[in-house]
Amino acid sequence: MIRTLSSASSLDEISVSYDVPVVDPTSVPKVLYGHRTSLDSLCDPEWSQESRVLVLYTGGTIGMVRNDRGKLAPIPRELETNIRRYPHMHDDSYATKRFGCNGNTPLVLPDCKEKRRVAYWVYEYEPLLDSSNMTMDDWIRIAKDIRGVYEMFDGFVVLHGTDTLAYTASALSFMLENLGKPVVITGSQIPIFETRSDGRDNFIGSVIMAGSYNIPEVTVFFNNKLYRGNRTTKVSTGRLQAFDSPNMPPLAIAGISIQVDYRSIFRPTRLEKFTVFDRLNRHVGLLRIFPSISAETVKQFLQPPISGAIIQTYGAGNMPSNRTDIMEVLRDATKRGVILVNTTQCMHGAVDTIYETGEALVSAGVIAGLDMTPEAALTKLSYVLAKSDWDYDTKKRMMMRNLRGEMTVVGQEDEGENQELDVVSAISRALQLSSSDDVERIRDLLVPTLFFTAVSNCDIKRLEEIFSNGAEVNLLDVSGWSALHMAACDGIAEVVTWLLQHGASVHVRDKQGQTPLKIAVENDHHKVVELLVQTGAHLTESPLRLGEVLVSAAAADNVERLKSYHIAGADLSCADPCGRTALHAACTVGSEECVRFLLEAGVPTTTRDRTDLTPAMCAQVNNHDHLARLIDEQEE
């Protein structure tokens, strides 16, 4: 796992090792590299000023440029160079002023009137691929590259050809488990650098969404709409509105301003860190039912090595009920352990077993896929089948469960879920409001205040009530604090747990760039720090800045602060600009408690500062010989 950023200069150096078996032998091995932009600037201690976005360019129309013959082609190592020439995609004056003029500064979007400026890095794969040539191994490579630098960036953008974009978006949504940051996939019908271009808007919009909005999902941004990735499908070969989400409205619409439907965001609710599941089962398929299809065709399709299949049926999931031969083939397949999922051939709507013909499929052991798109159903099946620790029944249950917002599961509503908050009802009556729109406006005004008050009062029952009335768990107050910031500051572990279980983001930053983890660390709430780290929170300071705060804590004899940083995953051996570590500082001031703790934590004892002093030398110079002896005993 990456612990520091100081030595990172390319993704090739920091990506995790790829020891995963090849899924598809026709897959073309790829190399990921950057052209000019170095990751060294990530060590800047003042990174709270900007959001950081990594752009991964896989190929496709969006990045094509005209070659010597005037034809559009994917030319390697040209994308970033060309972006730097466009002032609406790169603010060169800001980048030079902020990062210097050494030629490898990050790209920076012009001011978009968002909370923070967005700096971004472009890395591209070699070879660049037409998306028709994408394989499951490419999905795995993208997922693992994101994992390798996950803690360095606030969001990710994947540039992709449109033909298989929906498959990639769906696959990544399942593979990226407990995702806490935005991953936005985009492409275009016209390249970025053409005079008329949807690619330019799609690119800029994607970088803004990844860097400025707390939407921890794999999404698709296209034609000014942000869709849930596993709900999308390509609907046109020639229109700029090439993608749609047939059974779910967009998560965000970019007009004059960007309107986000925060209530629809599918957030992780498990107290677990982000991980990548890097196995997929390619022995899956799509079988579209048509009139007079032969039982032999279906039988051959379901022969080994097939492990699962999506059956695309008529209407609301119907099959010809008089075709007992086909039903018998399906029944035999499910008895052999093949997982079959029933989805509709229609663009809109869902599978329902209200008809006799649909019920017959259920009796044959076929699972209802509800309103999943073919892309989502297929990639979900590939993901589920690859889970070797799940038995057959568990895999079937998981296919029927809404894992990443890919399907609409209609359940019984909780009793009282839609009841109005008592205070909203009281005020509405007092103001004699009769319009539902007026009541909704009152609710929008009051709910944030009520929510923050309940957090402050540690009132879980009230939080449940307000949440059931549509409160957004990641609401921000005027200082940019979320409810999780507030609970982390107060050290209320019970409330922190509740917020995390209801989708609170551990990565939200306030106006000073501080995360809830940083707030908890600075207040030495160790239990809260543990909870946040367990859920994927990580420190965002550069090693140099971390060295400064650790040295300050040790110099102040603040062992609790050192413990807080240790629990948060900090490298306690980080040095400040003078080369001093926390152990140097503790030995200088004579803090035996800090020295003992740092030694137990494994901090090196031989590090020399800029004056060539080791921690033991610092102890001796300041007449703390007992500390020097402690260090000698440790070295022995």
Give, region by region, the residue ranges found by the protein language model.
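Ankyrin repeat A-helix N-terminal signature
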Residues: 453-458, 486-492, 519-525, 552-558, ...
